[in-house]
Amino acid sequence: GLPNVAKLFEATAQAELIHAAGHLKAPDKIQSTLDNLQDAIDGETHEFTEMYPPMLQEATTENHKARVMFGFAVAAEEVHAGLYKKALEAVREGKDLEVTDFYLCPVCGYIELGARPERCPICNTKGEKFVQYQA
């Protein structure tokens, strides 16, 4: 319907990736791993409870195709918050996460720890398409 507005969103999404990479390289302040994990939990929780739900609602109301991606984002961000919580618990115990393999769904952003899933539980993408990250 509105291709130029769509392009704006696409360009902004890429800009956000650039910003995120920049923040990782040069954080505004040096914090402990515990603080960084808590900030990550807070950020992910904000995204799946406050930021994406109104976008999802509006896209659904307008029957816009973006509703699918917003739905994926809500679900994936909740998973991310849970993973950061697991990491926070481990660090509080003086440990690292025990898993060494991480699998990222290239469609919705879901992350699976340990073993490649058969299919993504959020978007149903085949597990063979997941991107593996190893320590």
Q: Predicted regions: what is each one?
A:
Residues 1-135:
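Non-heme di-metal
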